């Protein structure tokens, strides 16, 4: 609805009907996508899974903070490996501290097992006829697995409602803002408008382009691409090579900050996803 000012703020059925009629005649309303009942259910399930992932992350932070407070330091290279977990279980703090650590580790185990079970269920949901083909296409991109692909599909719905890839990137808030006055133009950070959840997923996926050789395809990526048409695989390979090359150019040649480069890659990844979902892959 257009903003109303002055006397036009008076609301009656007759005035409202007149305004709605004018807006419809002049095409001032933007079309919206009404998600199906199935999409809504899957979306809620995926967000529930992400809530558990966030809870697991917080428990990990609490365990590490507990060890730091009591001067327990792990000599290994990485946390949350099998060696690190065995080390945590072998600790013998005094008195009540042992019980505290055991409760933390129990919560960690419960959440880890639940996430594993939920991820298996997500694989089953993605295998449904209504999602299988679309999920398979999106999984051809580096950093995009079943959970991310299915989340983007049910969160966005109909990709064809966006006239261009730029419109889709704008919808999820990955385009830069602008503050213009007269002849002066000032570029701002990304708008962060629209669907925050999709933006977060694509930003996380873009981190995978910060490592690995340009043009290299891992065994896991080849397995995900298996079963798709040669045209789909070629389009995804072109996107993967371009995005990885652009990331290295921004960071190494232009000395851009890593987060700035990752956000730029996330925006282009969104554009390539739009092309994949609307069959603009020529």
Region roles according to the model:
Residues 1-282:
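A detector of single, family-specific signature residues
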């Amino acid at each position: 609805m257009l903003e109303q000012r002055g006397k036009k703020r008076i609301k009656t059925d007759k005035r409202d009907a007149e305004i709605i009629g004018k807006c419809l005649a002049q095409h001032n309303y933007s079309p919206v996508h009404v998600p199906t009942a199935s999409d809504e259910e899957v979306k809620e399930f995926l967000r529930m899974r992400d809530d558990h992932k966030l809870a697991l992350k917080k428990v990990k932070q609490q365990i590490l903070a507990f060890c730091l407070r009591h001067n327990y330091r792990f000599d290994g290279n990485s946390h949350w490996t099998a060696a690190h977990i065995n080390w945590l279980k072998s600790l013998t703090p005094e008195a009540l501290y042992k019980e505290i650590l055991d409760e933390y580790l129990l919560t960690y185990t419960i959440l880890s097992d639940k996430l594993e079970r939920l991820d298996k269920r997500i694989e089953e949901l993605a295998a449904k006829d209504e999602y299988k083909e679309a999920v398979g296409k999106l999984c051809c991109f580096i950093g995009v697995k079943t959970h991310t692909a299915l989340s983007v599909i049910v969160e966005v719905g109909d990709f064809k409602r966006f006239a261009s890839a730029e419109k889709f990137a704008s919808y999820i808030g990955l385009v830069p803002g602008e503050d213009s006055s007269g002849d002066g133009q000032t570029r701002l950070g990304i708008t962060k408008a629209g669907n925050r959840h999709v933006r977060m997923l694509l930003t996380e996926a873009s981190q995978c382009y910060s490592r690995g050789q340009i043009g290299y395809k891992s065994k896991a990526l080849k397995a995900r691409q298996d079963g798709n048409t040669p045209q789909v695989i070629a389009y995804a390979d072109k996107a993967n090579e371009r995005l990885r090359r652009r990331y290295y150019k921004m960071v190494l040649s232009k000395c851009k900050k890593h987060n700035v480069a990752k956000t730029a890659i996330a925006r282009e990844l969104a554009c390539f996803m739009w092309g994949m979902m609307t069959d603009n892959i020529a």
